[in-house]
Amino acid sequence: MARRPARCYRYCKNKPYPKSRYNRAVPDSKIRIFDLGRKRAGVDEFPLCIHLVSNEYEQITSEALEAARICANKYLVKIGGKDSFHLRVRAHPFHVVRINKMLSCAGADRLQTGMRHAFGKPNGLVARVNIGQILMSVRTKDSSRATAIEALRRCQYKFPGQQRIIVSKKWGFSQYARDEYIEKRSRGEIIPDGCYAKFLNKRGSLQEKLDLFPEASFNLA
């Protein structure tokens, strides 16, 4: 039987139905890789962050997420090179959709029960997204801003509904605004931690803070 069109599963009508010990024999998700590009680049290397945000409350199939991932990755690698960006898919397909297979051949009424026992069997996985939820994010250098925006624009053709592209005010994937990050980094109150950053808080052992943040100035008065 051919794959049912994704428009049949676009709207969030029922409760979330994840894979569990009661819901077995679920097909594998089509998307298996969620981070691409230079994943190990430090937080200081890619200050610019751009998001693709959903404008609708809907379901997106794992096939659509995989198609968008391939589309964005190909364009970014072609224009900027494989080490010029870090792409992350932030919508994960956990909701299981079902199908009640119906026969259309002659004598089908003798072989099946129609809409009796019509619960259906697992057919695929979709991601349930809300309005304002981030679907994909790219962190890169300021010089690659136009390339990243164009890559995410092309991804919009792989998704149903409407999306918008937002240039984040944060520094990369961190939680700090760009001005705040530069200021605290110069004072030694922030240290890189992969693609994120650790910040100096006012709790905990003073000796641990001195070991972690040797460049920070501590007011012990």
From Swiss-Prot:
Main location: cytoplasm
Protein localization: Cytoplasm
Keywords attached to this entry: Cytoplasm, Ribonucleoprotein, Ribosomal protein
Keyword Isomerase appears in the UniProt entry: no
Pfam families according to UniProt: Ribosomal_L16 (PF00252)
This protein's GO CC annotations: cytosol; cytosolic large ribosomal subunit
Cited CDD domains: Ribosomal_L16_L10e
Disulphide bonds in the chain: none
GO process annotations (BP): cytoplasmic translation; translation
InterPro entries, per the entry: Ribosomal_uL16, Ribosomal_uL16_CS_euk_arc, Ribosomal_uL16_dom, Ribosomal_uL16_euk_arch, Ribosomal_uL16_sf
A Gene Ontology molecular function term of the record: structural constituent of ribosome
Subunit structure: Component of the large ribosomal subunit (LSU). Mature yeast ribosomes consist of a small (40S) and a large (60S) subunit. The 40S small subunit contains 1 molecule of ribosomal RNA (18S rRNA) and at least 33 different proteins. The large 60S subunit contains 3 rRNA molecules (25S, 5.8S and 5S rRNA) and at least 46 different proteins.
Family statement: Belongs to the universal ribosomal protein uL16 family.
Function of the protein: Component of the ribosome, a large ribonucleoprotein complex responsible for the synthesis of proteins in the cell. The small ribosomal subunit (SSU) binds messenger RNAs (mRNAs) and translates the encoded message by selecting cognate aminoacyl-transfer RNA (tRNA) molecules. The large subunit (LSU) contains the ribosomal catalytic site termed the peptidyl transferase center (PTC), which catalyzes the formation of peptide bonds, thereby polymerizing the amino acids delivered by tRNAs into a polypeptide chain.
Extra facts: There are 2 genes for uL16 in S.pombe.
PANTHER family membership: 60S RIBOSOMAL PROTEIN L10
Name of protein: Large ribosomal subunit protein uL16A
Protein's organism: Schizosaccharomyces pombe (strain 972 / ATCC 24843) (Fission yeast)
Lineage: Eukaryota, Fungi, Dikarya, Ascomycota, Taphrinomycotina
